[in-house]
């Protein structure tokens, strides 16, 4: 029996996908999910693998699962844009590509892709892709310009109240700015809609630890550990889960065909309850 660090296992699966070894990649993803059913990095591999296989229905479901954890995930939004375009749903295709653009507004490939999508929908290609409010919000957030970010987010939520990613950045900015009660209230609202949203659970766990240092783990931390088993090893002094050594989480990499996942649709339905974002 060969054990491998979970992060190294992810890198191995990524290489299989890059080499178009789709079925073997599926088997290794199933091996991880049998032990860690909500391990979110494996779902990133699965989404790309199902898209490579041209299984649109399952790849769409998986990308929506990822967005329920990371509402502005770059790869999931690009993947969903591609899927909606292929289904002829151009408004949704543009919406998801804009979400990706907001993370990388200076990326010329994304700008060109948006121009192409607008031309396909409207028969007119814009000369320039304008900076969106979402892109501005995320630029302010990355620079820790709390007041500017919060002001823009409140305007953004007035215009688009369903933008969960805006609410999430608002909670993060409020927490960092010291408005912790308002940050916690915002996160409670988010997890009522997206129970496994990473950042919201992370902030709520920090708030719980501040109040109950001697008590057992919070439900929020347990959820985070379901999504990333390395989170079980987080200590108060640990800055980020990425600082946990790779070898902390090991998994057997020998495949057992009898324990594979034959019906991915049922597995996803049993493991997650997620609506399209």
Across the structure, where does each feature detected by a protein language model lie?
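Alpha-helical segment of the N-proximal tetratricopeptide repeat
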Residues: 4-41, 45-58, 131-158
